[in-house]
Amino acid sequence: MKNSFIGTTGRIPLWIVGFVVGSLALGLLGILFYGSYTGLGSSL
């Protein structure tokens, strides 16, 4: 199963890595901004 995800470079495609990292970063920022806006993270 794992071999099917390995390409010619032996690494995960860069666009997949960028998409995952970007999604996690935006999600984390969204949670932080939402928390600070609603007052849940205002104590931080």
Swiss-Prot record:
It is a single-pass membrane protein. One of its GO terms (cellular component) is chloroplast thylakoid membrane. Keywords: Chloroplast, Membrane, Photosynthesis, Photosystem II, Plastid, Reaction center, Thylakoid, Transmembrane, Transmembrane helix. The chain crosses the membrane at residues 12-32. Coiled coil: none annotated. Pfam families: PsbJ (PF01788). InterPro entries: PSII_PsbJ, PSII_PsbJ_sf. One of its GO terms (biological process) is photosynthesis. It comes from the Eukaryota. It is found in: Plastid, Chloroplast thylakoid membrane. Its main location: plastid. PSII is composed of 1 copy each of membrane proteins PsbA, PsbB, PsbC, PsbD, PsbE, PsbF, PsbH, PsbI, PsbJ, PsbK, PsbL, PsbM, PsbT, PsbY, PsbZ, Psb30/Ycf12, at least 3 peripheral proteins of the oxygen-evolving complex and a large number of cofactors. It forms dimeric complexes. HAMAP family: PSII_PsbJ (MF_01305). Belongs to the PsbJ family. One of the components of the core complex of photosystem II (PSII). PSII is a light-driven water:plastoquinone oxidoreductase that uses light energy to abstract electrons from H(2)O, generating O(2) and a proton gradient subsequently used for ATP formation. It consists of a core antenna complex that captures photons, and an electron transfer chain that converts photonic excitation into a charge separation. This is Photosystem II reaction center protein J.
